[in-house]
């Protein structure tokens, strides 16, 4: 999946110029899901090698990932001695060759590092790569997984009801309980079970944020 915004020009070198990952890659800045925003509580007990310095660009540090996992956006980045030097700003490139940029903290110069210098991250700020890979399709004839949501409703109350039954309940106009064993739960306009506006399950407003999430993405997977 890709995040909001494209990769900044001039960040890449050679064949990786721009680090545009195309389909299934990472590109751009994080906002929305996957971003990490909280107070700085100091360095973690353990840090793990995250990236290797490539070059400085526009005041930021461009790194090649040397970790099999994906960092959170805005995750603190450290030196091996746990000195904080900045935060993850962008994640770029295809999912099998990830790059990321570090926005240095005040007083840290991106040009003060040299090629091959290592940067580290706390283990709790990493996500497994599998989270961003498409799920395999079930074999033909395999039973479909049941949707989470309300159980199938019974017959409900009488069709006509007494006084106060409300017009439109039998016709399924404005929500309410569907009278004849409908799809269960509360629904606007039928559809699958659970709470829904025209579709099955839970449907968040606006769908998944941030587009398709084939790589590091913030929307659907």
Curated annotation (Swiss-Prot):
Stretches the record annotates as RGG-box 2: 152-220
> Which molecular function GO terms apply here?
box H/ACA snoRNA binding
Q: Taxonomically, which superkingdom?
A: Eukaryota
The UniProt annotation puts the region (Disordered) at: 1-42, 130-221
Q: Which UniProt keywords apply?
A: Nucleus, Repeat, Ribonucleoprotein, Ribosome biogenesis, RNA-binding, rRNA processing
GO biological process annotation, one example: snoRNA guided rRNA pseudouridine synthesis
Write down a Pfam family by its short name.
Gar1
> Which residue ranges does the record annotate as region RGG-box 1?
4-35
The record's section on SUPFAM superfamilies has:
Translation proteins
One GO CC term of this entry?
Answer: box H/ACA snoRNP complex
Q: Where in the cell is it found?
A: Nucleus, Nucleolus
Composition bias (Gly residues) maps to 1-35, 150-221
Subunit-structure text = Component of the small nucleolar ribonucleoprotein particles containing H/ACA-type snoRNAs (H/ACA snoRNPs).
Family, per the entry? Answer: Belongs to the GAR1 family.
Described function: Non-catalytic component of the H/ACA small nucleolar ribonucleoprotein (H/ACA snoRNP), which catalyzes pseudouridylation of rRNA and is required for ribosome biogenesis. This involves the isomerization of uridine such that the ribose is subsequently attached to C5, instead of the normal N1. Pseudouridine ('psi') residues may serve to stabilize the conformation of rRNAs. The H/ACA snoRNP complex also mediates pseudouridylation of other types of RNAs. The H/ACA snoRNP complex mediates pseudouridylation at position 93 in U2 snRNA.
Q: Spell out the protein name for this chain.
A: H/ACA ribonucleoprotein complex subunit GAR1
The organism that produces this protein has a lineage beginning with: Eukaryota, Fungi, Dikarya, Ascomycota, Pezizomycotina
């Amino acid at each position: 999946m890709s995040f909001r915004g494209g990769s900044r020009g001039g960040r890449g070198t050679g064949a990786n110029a721009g680090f545009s990952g195309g389909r299934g890659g990472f590109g751009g800045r994080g906002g929305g899901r996957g971003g990490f925003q909280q107070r700085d509580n100091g360095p973690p007990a353990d840090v793990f090698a995250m990236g290797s310095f490539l070059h400085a660009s526009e005041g930021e540090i461009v790194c090649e990932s040397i970790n099999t996992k994906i960092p959170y956006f805005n995750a603190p980045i450290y030196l091996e001695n746990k000195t904080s030097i900045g935060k993850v700003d962008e994640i770029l490139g295809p999912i099998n060759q990830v790059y990321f940029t570090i926005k240095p903290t005040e007083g840290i110069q991106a040009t003060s590092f040299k090629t091959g210098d290592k940067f580290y991250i706390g283990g709790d700020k990493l996500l497994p790569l599998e989270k961003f890979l498409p799920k395999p399709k079930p074999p033909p004839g395999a039973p479909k997984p049941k949707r989470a949501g309300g159980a199938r409703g019974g017959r409900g109350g009488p069709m006509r009801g007494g006084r106060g039954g409300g017009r439109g309940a039998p016709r399924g106009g404005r929500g309410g309980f569907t009278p004849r064993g409908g799809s269960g739960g509360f629904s606007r306009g039928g559809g699958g079970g659970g709470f829904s506006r025209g579709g099955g399950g839970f449907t968040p407003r606006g769908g998944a944020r941030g587009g398709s999430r084939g790589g590091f993405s913030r929307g659907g997977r």
